[in-house]
Amino acid sequence: MEINRAEIRREITRYAGLIEQQTQINITDNDQDILKTLIADYNLRMRRDALLGELARLDELRDISQIKGDEYKLTIPLLPIISTLNQHEFEIIQANIETDFIADNVTFITSFIPADLDLEQTIQHVFFRTTATTPYFRSFNLVIAILDYDEDKGDVKLDVKITITRSNNGVFNYNYTWAGKDYERVSICYNLISYLQQINGPRGRDDEAEMPIYEIVRQNNGSQPSYASGEHLYIVSSHLHVDEIVRDREHRDISVDVTELNLMFPIVRMFDPVDLRDIRIEDVTPGIEFTINMEVSTYLTELSGSHVDTQRTIMNHAEKIVGNYTGQQWNVQSNMLSEVRTQKLEEEDEEARQRGDYTTSTLVQTMAQVSDLFSSTILYRYAEAELDNTVGAFELLRPVMSIPTEYIHDGRIGPITNISASASIVTSSNNGVGEVRNIFKPIGDQTINEAHFANVYSNDEYAIYLRFSYRQAPVQSETVYLQQALPSMRIVSPSSVSTTVSTALIGGNTIRINCPIRPHREDNFVAGGVQIPRQSTAVEIHVQEILIGYRQATTFPIDTEGRLSLELMYGLESRSAVGNTMSPVRFVTVNDGEFFGLTCPIDLTLSTIVDPASYLSDGVILVTTAFEDLRGYAWLATLGGDWPRTYNSSMGAFNIFTGGDINLSTEYGSEMTYTFKVELPINYMFNNMTISSHNVPRVPVLGVTYASIYQDSRTDLEARRFLQTLVFRIHGSWSARVPYPPGNLPTRNTANQHQDIQQVINDSIFQELDRLSDELLDLENRLDHLERQFEMFIQSQESEWWEILLNVVIDISIGYFSTFAGDALKNAQRAITKAVGYTRRVLMTVTKTMRNGTIFTRLLGAKNLSGQALASLETLVESALRSINMKKSRFMRGAEPLYKTNKVAQHIDNTEKMNMMMDFSFANRNNRQNITADTLSKMHTQNAHGTSDTILPAMRVYYRPLGFLDKRVGDALHTGITRPEALKKQLRSDVANVGTRAPSHAFMTYTDVLYEDAGSYIVSKRYLGIGELNKFGRTTSDKNAGIGGVNIKYRVNKITADGKYIIDRLDYTESGYTALDVDRLYSSLFGKQGDGLSTEQKWMDISKGVDAKIISADMVSEEFLSSKYTGQMIDELINSPPQFNYSLVYRNCQDFALDVLRVAQGFSPSNKWDVSTAARMQQRRVISLMDDLMGESETFARSGRASQLLLRQVRESYVKARKRGDLQAVKALQLRFKGFF
């Protein structure tokens, strides 16, 4: 061996510190062994320092999460060595007695267990500290006394006494007391930890513990075993089950000798709830990796100190282990760490090369997703209408009779009766024509119920109906008309072509004419006529409401408003009323089916008695003409020969029902023929109206037709029966947003609308161009704002990717067919390009410790890339890919994500956590197969009192035993039949076929996080289910059918100095509740009023009560959702729940919870889905989406405020430039903001 003596001298001086640096040492051949020892020790020390440096560099790759509830884990691969617990570790676990190392475990089985804990959680209390030497002791005695046990509540209090007998016969006693609440079973075990030299056995078997019994021979000298000797640290343990002690409430002493202890695996596990720390040191057989883990329980983080302190403790422990390495161990360990680092850097480099392509493709992929959304979503369109004096009529069944009359059509037709204003009336009577047959078939009282709908107006878009009731009944009258034939006389008009053939006796006779009148159309189209009542009739018409039904509406309209007035006219009676409110409605008609539309309540009643003798009064009368020129109207008399004579005559006005007198006188008492003329003037009853051509007959509610009632010789074509017609007039306007079925994409709708507008504005093209210029300016401002938002999002990583990207797509869609569409797309591409540039910059921060120049070159020469930036970028990329069910392999060449191939890489950065969340969030079934219970635990979710600290909202479904059953029966059914663990697996793989008849109650929670400002978040925790608490005060239970829930909000403030979080429950007003709402929520949750408690105290109790329900249930499903609209749908069900059609077997609480989960995941609900619930959720989701599209969301609100500020600043700059005469600045502003000035 060649020795460099000068080097040895320098190292001896530096290492030993015994001789000054200038001192020379004479080395002889006899000193060869000493030199070898010194050199070996020096090399080992140098290698150890280098190894610790490698560990430190690995630690730099590990990002320390600052999110509350994050469970810190660090795993460092080290070679297997033997390690013992030292003084520092025992100080951490609060040991307090210096004697032999003994631990006892008390296991509490409870029904009040957080969902993230095992059912049987062992609480291990270490109460002895090790000493430098472990003295031998012969035995120890354990005494357990039950001090108190409440079987109903599950509260238990135990007294534990341990007596140790040492080898020198010394005795040491230790006593302590255990107390716990709501426990169902208690078992106690204890561990004896000792260094062993020999284990003989097995000597028997412990049937209760199902373990063999070994004889233990202890090392006599008590020295610590070494690695070379092959001796190891073991634990011997014994379990004492004391269920019977608790159940029987007995006091029992248990004594166990050392030789009866059972041999366990050599693993030490300690958990001290006081210090809130869990240190696990595992030592398995040589040749297998030795792992050091330190874990901090998630719900106890705040009291355990910062993560940095925890990391430092682990690294200190690792340094102590490395200090025991030999030279060969160091070489193996160093190679292992170098390989890990190299492998990690290469894999990171392979994935980093493709990240720019991910971001560039995001826009197109998300547009496809939005396209699919619109193709399957109900759209609300704004609709408005106006009716201006719209008049119509429809017939009502009445007992009527016909009056035979003829008239000649001459001039304009009247609006109601079709009788001309100047018609000539011809009455006739010959050969019994005037006899009236009994044409009325009595049918008794006629009543139309209040479900009757009358269609009064209709077009292609909507139909208007009146909902009314109608009743009529005959009134007793002594007058019966037309019982005999008319006299043999024919009265004709001189203007008509007819032959005078009738005769009458002369000689001063007075002839009484009782002439019924029946108007008759003298054309070939229709035979019209006037009907009059046969006898007096009482009529009552009551209109309840005006209904407007939209033909294509699929559910209830929203944002309704309007005003309608209605006037009814029946005969000579008229009434009017006004309705000032509009509200959504669903109604079903007999002929037209179901409608969704609007209702305008109107309370209008018209009552009258129709009397044939007095109904028309003087409105229609038969009068004489003015015989001014009698020569043209001479009476002709025949007395044995024709010789003309002129006589006086008079004909007074008379009513057509009561008759009148015509007095004829002649000079001779002979038979003569007379000719004269009469008129029938028509008084118009309704002025200034527009008559509607649409006239719909009444639905035959009574099951009769016109032919069965009117049994005369005429056909059913007889129309315009004035005296049995209800005339109406509607005036007013309304507006609403009407739901239409899924249609075309927004861009296509925009194009169609653009074409329609162009057709309308051809006559005003210049004005329209100005308006379009303003719109384009607004679009450009929005795109500029969104570009800034996009850049801010990449940097802050606080906003939701979906919200911003959706706004980008919307703006591009709106401007797609406009003049500046190319600029819009260019601006959007520029935003994406800048984001890619920034991404490339932050991506490189993770390589700050890299020494490989080739890798740096491939990573574009950047200097820095942090794990946090890598994880954030992964969120952007994966959300776009998963939204359209695409894989990274479509855009990447190379390996799978690291978490699938190399578990070591899980602890380098957060990339694998983002991969898992994206796989799980978007219901990608192929990737979800890689999601296991172990990997899900790395998502940092908290199920009990905190919030979800993931980047996505979380929806969780819980099952718990039925509360109305006996507790033991309910728990047994829940555990044995429902089987929550099996149900959880089934929900992960096959949610569509999960049964819903388990003997358990189901409910759900939805938690999301809204970034408020730097270091502050608003957390909303929504609790929803069937039969749960509600703000309406309904009684709740597991069997009730109503939908209930509550929304509780918290503010989370981060203290960046030490990484802690502070959670404050917000006031009930922040959740949108009033004091009355809180009172009702409290009474529905606890079944009492809470007299004497303040509203704030009740709100706090409600929060704790909801937490208790969640903690005591089993979580069977946990989904991470990307859409922000799910929370608004849940709020709609909580605040305005629809009627739930509950069925214990077919549609119960489990159906409700699982179907809401399916809808939130984007799947179709089951065939048990309640229509009203689905419509309400879809309605709220669409309203929120349309608010975004119409610029009414928070995003656009912020954009609007920024735009207003920008415009104000531009306007001020423009005015200042004009005042100072800066023409160049004025021109620049005018060009930049064309159309604004």
Curated annotation (Swiss-Prot):
UniProt entry tagged with the keyword Transport:
no
Q: Where is the PPPDE domain?
A: 963-1178
Single GO cellular component annotation? viral capsid
Give the record's keywords alphabetically: Capsid protein, Virion
InterPro entries referenced in this protein's UniProt entry, alphabetically: PPPDE_dom
Q: Which residues form the active site?
A: 1001, 1149
What is the first-listed, main subcellular location in coarse terms? virion
Protein's name according to its UniProt entry: Putative structural protein VP3
Q: What taxonomic lineage is listed for the species of origin? A: Viruses, Riboviria, Orthornavirae, Duplornaviricota, Resentoviricetes
